Each structure stands twice: as C-alpha cells, then as structure tokens.
Amino acid sequence: KTAFDIASWIVGSEMCISDCVYWEIGTKAADYDVLLRWWTQYAAGRPLFIGEDIDRTVKFGQQAQKRALSQQMPNVKGTVLWYAKVAVDDTGNYGTTLRRDYWRYPALQPQMPFIDKKAPKSPRKVKPVWTSDGYILFWTAPKGNNWDDVATCYVVYCFEKGEQINIDDPSKILAVTSQTFFKLPYKNGRQKYTYVVTALDRLHNESKPVKKTVKL
C-alpha cells in the first residue's frame, strides 16, 4: 500500500475525499472528465469534493460543463474552489454564476452514513409567541445524550398555503441556525404559512419535521 495506491487506502477509511482535478475537460494528459469518473469509481462510496482551478475553468469557458458532469456523479457532493479569491473577485462572472444558478439556496452538508446515520429526535414545543421584539417561533432542543444524537443546529423551512411540505426543496430553507428561535416576518396577520423545523446532529443527519401553521 503506497500513497499512490488510492483504491487500497480508501477502503475502510472513515473519511471524505477532496481530490485536485485542476485541469480542463479535454486535456490530453489529464482530462477532467476521465479523472472525475476515475475518482467516482474508486472512491468506495465516500463523498467526493472536487478541487477545481477557477482560472482554468474560466479560461476555457467550462463552468457549465464541469457542473453538469459533477451532477451526473452520485457521490460528488461539492467543490473546493482554488483559489477562492478568484470567485470573490468574480473573474469571468464565476462568482455571479455560482450565486445565481448553482448555489442560490442554503445547503446542508453531505451526509456520511459510514460514520453515523441515526437522526436526532425532533425539536420539541414548537410554538409562535408574541414578544416585545415581534412574533417569534420558539422550540426546545430534543433530548440526546451522546455526540451522535445531540442536536447541534436546526433548519427552518417555510411553505405557503396549499404548498406541499417537501423538506428536500432547498428553496424553502429560511435558516440553518444554532438558536432555538426564529423571528417571523409578520405583515398583517391575513396570510397562512406553514413553518417546519427540523434538528440536525453534528453530521447533519436530519430529524423528522415538526410543523406549525401561523398567520402572518
């Protein structure tokens, strides 16, 4: 077993993998497409976070192609941007495209069931309360004793009247918070909304949802 024997040292490891695939699609010596498929094949089911050279991606106009290719791979769970300042500086509209098209909504971290897959219990006593600071949705942390069943943060979703409750839709996430309250955007008390709160453990296993309908 050597540092280059990827298929050997990954097996049995409790880890995720961040591989540096800095080249572009079509590079003769190191094709991004070929390398991505290779890593997917030998990742042993571990989540992959692809290291991407933003300058190269922008230079060859391959942002959309690389995103589409990554989305085809079931265990590619994210991207490591190198270097991040290029995205912040919005070189080639890279950062704008991320915010507008790919990363528009909040996201939960990828799950790692090979470490722990048991979800925490649901939040308790979810209740909207009028306070001097406005209309607040409060809840109580679920009971948990060990690191793998204690809630570390919560997800707050909002659905309009008549909408199907679907916590797999990230556009409905209003907040991921470590607080046990959320300030509601009260308007005139005429419109019904259903707020959903779930608990996350430190590996982001998500509890069953708790619903509360309020008029805002």
Annotate each language-model stretch with its function.
Residues 98-148, 204-216:
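Pro/Thr/Ser/Gly-rich low-complexity, intrinsically disordered linker/stalk tracts
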Residues 184-206:
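Beta-strand-rich modules
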Residues 142-168:
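Solvent-exposed loop/turn segments flanking beta-strands in beta-repeat/beta-sandwich domains
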Residues 22-27, 54-57, 84-88:
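Solvent-exposed loop/turn segments at secondary-structure junctions
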Residues 1, 21, 35-66:
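Active-site clefts of carbohydrate-active enzymes
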Residues 2-12, 16:
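Single conserved hydrophobic/aromatic residue that forms the stacking wall/gate
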